[in-house]
């Protein structure tokens, strides 16, 4: 499954005194099996971009093509339904949208709406919940008797229960404790590597971006100003400063180390493990 943006612009309240162009002339492509991160300041157009992915918003100008379906501002919703079935959208604080009295009913709400096999959906959701640390009897419990972090994980899995090919998540770990953050991020990564799903992550946490993403899309004032690998992105401190993007902690540590020892390691470390490996190599060659 491939999603392609061709010269996509979106204007809110078009034709009124309050009209605002949130994204303009966006050209990019999302491929199944890859992990994308979308970063940029608040108001840079990230949320508008992802809402055009499955036509929650339709382009004011330009086209979004999902496999053989082309979406424009004129496309009727009945032609978009197959797209929405294959693209799972998890917005910020999804726990606020929980409403069923048991976890099981919450899990089958989406699949039932799309006339999917409910037993398969329940089994798939149960496996994902177990991966997130829930007990085996979780399906019979009420989500409203759980902690905020547990409710967040329940809400995320309720979207994943539809087994979408492309998963779009907007700040999924905001406000979670460190263990829950790791569980959610590792689950998303495993869905990419083990099930060939595309992950599209909006995040302000550059540590997550560095560790998990294959490609990073940087947005500024409604435009894509960069689309590259994390290693290439975090090499250019001047551009990062201009885009108001912080360095990941491990990359900052590497730069501090290099400055202190007046040296240059052979590569950019995106994880603690990679930094340790580069450090050992540097020690060996001293």
Swiss-Prot record:
The signal peptide, as residue positions, is: none
Main subcellular localisation: membrane
Any one Pfam family match given in the protein's UniProt record, by short name:
ABC_tran
The protein's topology relative to the membrane is: Peripheral membrane protein
- The EC number(s) given in the record are 7.-.-.-
Q: By its UniProt entry, which Gene3D superfamilies does this protein fall under?
A: P-loop containing nucleotide triphosphate hydrolases (3.40.50.300)
UniProt enzyme class:
translocase
Binding positions for ATP per the UniProt entry: 40-47
Q: Does the keyword ATP-binding apply?
A: yes
Spell out the CDD domains in the cross-references. Answer: ABC_cobalt_CbiO_domain1
Coiled-coil annotation: which residues? none
Question: What GO molecular functions are on record for this protein?
Answer: ATP binding; ATP hydrolysis activity; ATPase-coupled transmembrane transporter activity
Q: Which GO terms describe its cellular component?
A: ATP-binding cassette (ABC) transporter complex
- Which keywords annotate this record? ATP-binding, Cell membrane, Membrane, Nucleotide-binding, Translocase, Transport
Record-linked SMART domains: AAA
What are the ABC transporter domain coordinates in residue numbering?
A: 3-246
Localization: Cell membrane
Q: How does it assemble?
A: Forms a stable energy-coupling factor (ECF) transporter complex composed of 2 membrane-embedded substrate-binding proteins (S component), 2 ATP-binding proteins (A component) and 2 transmembrane proteins (T component).
**Family membership:** Belongs to the ABC transporter superfamily. Energy-coupling factor EcfA family.
Protein function = ATP-binding (A) component of a common energy-coupling factor (ECF) ABC-transporter complex. Unlike classic ABC transporters this ECF transporter provides the energy necessary to transport a number of different substrates.
- Recorded protein name is Energy-coupling factor transporter ATP-binding protein EcfA2
- Its source organism is Staphylococcus aureus (strain bovine RF122 / ET3-1)
Gene name of the encoded protein? ecfA2
